[in-house]
Every structure is written in C-alpha cells, then in structure tokens.
C-alpha cells in the first residue's frame, strides 16, 4: 500500500468530549461504504507507556493527562508502517492495572485510519502523519460529568478518586496542553459526538482525500 492510499484522521479533545462516539459513527458508516476491512480505529490510550517495572502505588501517581505519559513515537512508527503496507501490533493497556498487558492487537493496512485521543494534536510529529484533524470542543463541565459516570461504571474507579484526579491533573493538563492544541485542528466540533453536520463534513473530507 502506498502512503497516498491511506488516509489518517485524528480526533482530539478532552476526555469524554465525544471523540469515541464520533469515531465509532464514522467507522460504522464508512464500513458500509468501503467495507469493514478498509477502516481501522486506533485509540491513543493504547499507547500509554508500559509501567510493569513500577509498583501499583507508583503507577497510580502517574499523570496520565501529560503528553509524556504516552509513547507517541511508537504510534508514529506504527502509522508509517501501516502507510507502507505493513501490519502492526498495537499494545493493549489495562486501566485496572495501570500498565500494558502481554496482549497485542494486530492491525493490517487500511484505506482509512481513525485516531482518537486527548493529546493527539500536542505532538508535531504526530500531526504530520494526519491528513485531517478534528477537535471536539465540548464544555469541560459536561466532559467531567461524563467521565465521572464512565470511570466509575466501566473502569472500577471510586467517585472520590475520579474527582481527585480531575482536580489535580485532568483539568490543569486540559488547560495547559489539550485546549491550546485546538489551534492545530482543521475542524472544530461543538456539541459533542452527536453533531450530525460535523460528522457529515468529516466523512465528506475523508471521501475527498480518498478520491485524490
């Protein structure tokens, strides 16, 4: 596969801003148009650094909302490999254990790769790998309420720990890194992942890039 045959779309924004929802919607609709074997989704979360050498007490102190917590270099390497026609083994990250597992998920080359993650647009090298980028501009208080519900229900967190993390790292890192990265987005999406007009615009852009 030649690099021009692979379109990479990056969807960034605060945690619980609607990134996964719009990525899922675009994935499902493009699968109907292009086939399920032609579209891939990569979550930035999979590239949290391995912390197997640290104790659990040390792992929970990691600032997961800082760019240094993520191995963007590996993500860039994987994107370049996919563009060159090579399959890659994506890490599997455990939210309960705060480190990578021994498992890998193999992703084969696709016509469209959809990236989604909070810090995608903070990395210049990663931005260069994207053909188009999106920032989900959802109010932070709404994101917090969604995150609180999600992390308690799906990730085994206590309400107190989620609130403490939000105060100590999530909100400060959003203001320091994530919100400023909005300037690099090609499309800014208000009102979350259910914004139908924004979804249609992004799909049209992807189809235009594929037609080149």
From Swiss-Prot:
Reaction(s) catalysed by this chain's protein: uridine + ATP = UMP + ADP + H(+); cytidine + ATP = CMP + ADP + H(+)
- Protein localization: Cytoplasm
- Which GO cellular component terms are attached? cytoplasm
Recorded metabolic or biological pathway in which this protein acts: Pyrimidine metabolism; CTP biosynthesis via salvage pathway; CTP from cytidine: step 1/3; Pyrimidine metabolism; UMP biosynthesis via salvage pathway; UMP from uridine: step 1/1
Between which residues do disulfide bridges form? none
Q: Main location per UniProt?
A: cytoplasm
Task: Give the Enzyme Commission number.
Answer: 2.7.1.48
Q: Which UniProt keywords apply?
A: ATP-binding, Cytoplasm, Kinase, Nucleotide-binding, Transferase
Question: Member of which family?
Answer: Belongs to the uridine kinase family.
Protein name, entry field: Uridine kinase
């Amino acid at each position: 596969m030649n690099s021009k045959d692979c379109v990479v779309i990056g969807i960034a924004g605060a945690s619980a801003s609607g990134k996964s929802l719009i990525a899922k919607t675009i994935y499902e609709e493009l699968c109907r148009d292009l086939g399920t074997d032609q579209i891939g989704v990569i979550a930035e979360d999979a590239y949290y650094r391995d912390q197997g050498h640290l104790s659990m007490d040390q792992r929970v102190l990691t600032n997961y909302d800082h760019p240094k917590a993520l191995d963007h270099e590996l993500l860039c390497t994987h994107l370049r490999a996919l563009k060159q026609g090579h399959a890659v083994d994506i890490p599997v990250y455990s939210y309960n254990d705060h480190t990578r597992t021994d498992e890998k998920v193999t992703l084969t080359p696709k016509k469209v790769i959809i990236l989604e993650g909070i810090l995608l647009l903070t990395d210049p090298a990663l931005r260069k790998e994207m053909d188009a980028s999106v920032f989900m501009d959802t109010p932070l208080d709404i994101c917090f309420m969604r995150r609180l519900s999600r992390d308690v229900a799906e990730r085994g967190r206590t309400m107190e720990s989620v609130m403490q993390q939000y105060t100590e790292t999530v909100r400060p890192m959003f203001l320091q890194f994530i919100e400023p990265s909005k300037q690099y987005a090609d499309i800014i999406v208000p009102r979350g992942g259910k914004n139908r007009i924004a979804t249609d615009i992004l799909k049209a852009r992807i189809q235009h890039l594929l037609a080149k």
